[in-house]
Amino acid sequence: MFAVENGLQGDPRLKAISDAIRVIPHFPKTGIMFQDITTLLLDPVAFKHVVDIFVDRYKHMNISLVAGVEARGFIFGPPIALAIGAKFVPLRKPGKLPGRVISEEYELEYGRDCLEMSVEAVKSEERALIIDDLVATGGTLSASINLLERAGAEVVECACVVGLPKFKGQCKLKGKPLYVLVEPNQFDELTL
């Protein structure tokens, strides 16, 4: 579900967020329109809007953990977790976490990847929110859901700042809700 479908249509914070995200054509390869959140992070007002919208949504959902996907989920996850009184759990690329981990491989558009999580990070029946900067195919979010559920957590929702408009990966999310603030085609519409 996009934020504009959830009562935020016309909210000036969405325009500020959209305006703060730079689109870089043909990066990292031809045909890709890279959604660069670096410029969003340089705008403290827009960055705060992102955190505030997510906090408003999740503060009464009894979320006990926020799982952030490496690397940009690490940017948004901790301030949201602190604001709603939850712990933050990093989901990392292989070999980055000390101690015992569980792993989940997943398909990318052109290949495979893997996420890992500390086995001590999650307790059975905790309520989890997964946060990342962008959803394209749903592969990374799906792997994140699998990791958390294998550890006994209940995934309440997945949340991303940007959702690609042709996203078909919701079917990969095992029926879990997806909440997205903006989509790339909104950038042009909102700046008219």
Swiss-Prot record:
The keyword Hydrolase does not apply. It catalyses: AMP + diphosphate = 5-phospho-alpha-D-ribose 1-diphosphate + adenine. Homodimer. Pathway: Purine metabolism; AMP biosynthesis via salvage pathway; AMP from adenine: step 1/1. Belongs to the purine/pyrimidine phosphoribosyltransferase family. This is Adenine phosphoribosyltransferase 2. Optimum pH is 7.4-7.5.
